[in-house]
């Protein structure tokens, strides 16, 4: 199956359930293609979990869901070794991370210790328990949902954990027309339960392989570097403790642009791909005292201020 056909099929399948969330869906598909992970944030009831489930049901892959709570332990996520009396030896019981798609629901309701249990899984695609490392089968895609930190009973994700997410996406609200359509679609049915598979795990592996081959013009590479460098030069205006985007963030920016180009049906990157993924990729990597809206304003300002040459972006 061609990559553009595959992504279109998944997008249309998700649209049977999700209303008015096309751009959110496309960003999530770009992250999947790029081999990254996604953090969905918004207040309760905006469709974060439904979107994650819709993607999982669209793919013929293993799926696990973990409801993060304050009493959840790291071993509840990664698995644990226990003494098997029948065998007279220790046996490893796999945790829910041993799957293809992991929904970490309300991740910021768990303690930082439990949140950190996902660090190695997300960064390296492996789990180490009791000194033994086990490799996770690709594709491995974490979709985490979280409520805003102002919500009671939440633990803000540490910076190292945030940096493991390729994108942080806000769900956004619904228009009156979209809300009426929501009622019409769900009044006599449950579309999510009727959603079928449109691809396989092997399709996703081939998609991620194709993403690495997406072409980027040298001028666009320089454009990304200039944008990232600019985030590190705003210390005075951004306040104390300011940190710009890390080198890992630079690579994430590249991968996200490659993924979005595939979603758009191209095998090369154009400036619009970079601009579209800039806020979801960069904002959660900016460490400082600024509010979320201020970070978005800063990134959008950089997009407008950094010079972008005009070229034939397909030319190799």
Model-derived features: positions:
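Walker B catalytic acidic pair
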Residues: 42, 105-106, 117
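Canonical AAA+ ATPase core
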Residues: 84-89, 110, 114, 122-201, ...
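Conserved alpha-helical scaffold flanking the Walker A/P-loop in AAA+ ATPase domains
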Residues: 26-30, 83-103
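Walker A/P-loop
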Residues: 32-69
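C-terminal engagement/docking regions of AAA+ P-loop ATPases
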Residues: 233-316
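AAA+/P-loop NTPase substrate/partner-engagement loops
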Residues: 58-86
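P-loop (Walker A) phosphate-binding loop of NTP-binding proteins
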Residues: 43, 77, 145
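Pre-Walker A (pre-P-loop) alpha-helix and adjacent loop at the N terminus of AAA/AAA+ ATPase modules
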Residues: 2-43
């Amino acid at each position: 199956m061609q990559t553009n056909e595959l992504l279109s099929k998944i997008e249309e399948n998700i649209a049977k359930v999700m209303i008015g969330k096309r751009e959110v869906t496309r960003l999530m598909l770009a992250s999947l293609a790029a081999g990254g992970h996604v953090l969905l944030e918004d207040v309760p009831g905006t469709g974060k979990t439904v979107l994650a489930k819709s993607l999982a049901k669209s793919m013929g892959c293993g799926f696990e869901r973990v409801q993060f709570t304050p009493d959840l332990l790291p071993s509840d996520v990664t698995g644990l070794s226990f003494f098997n009396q029948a065998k007279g030896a220790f046996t490893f019981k796999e945790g829910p991370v041993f799957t293809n798609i992991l929904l970490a629901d309300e991740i910021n309701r768990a303690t930082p210790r439990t949140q950190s249990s996902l660090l190695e899984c997300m960064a390296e695609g492996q789990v180490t328990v009791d000194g033994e490392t086990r490799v996770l089968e690709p594709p491995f895609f974490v979709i985490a949902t979280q409520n805003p930190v102002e919500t009671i009973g939440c633990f803000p994700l540490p910076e190292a954990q945030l940096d493991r997410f390729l994108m942080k996406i806000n769900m956004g609200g619904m228009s009156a027309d979209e809300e009426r359509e929501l009622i019409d679609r769900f009044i006599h049915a449950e579309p999510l339960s009727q959603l079928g598979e449109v691809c396989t795990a092997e399709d996703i592996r081939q998609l991620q392989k194709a993403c690495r081959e997406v072409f980027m013009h040298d001028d666009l590479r320089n454009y990304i570097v200039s944008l990232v460098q600019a985030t590190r030069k705003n210390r005075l205006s951004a306040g104390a403790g300011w940190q710009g985007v890390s080198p890992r963030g630079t690579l994430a920016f590249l991968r996200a642009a490659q993924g979005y180009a595939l979603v758009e049906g191209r095998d090369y990157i154009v400036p619009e791909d970079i601009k579209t993924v800039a806020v979801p990729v960069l904002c959660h990597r900016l460490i400082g005292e600024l509010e979320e809206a201020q970070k978005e304003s800063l990134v959008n300002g950089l997009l407008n201020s950094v010079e972008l040459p005009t070229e034939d972006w397909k030319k190799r």
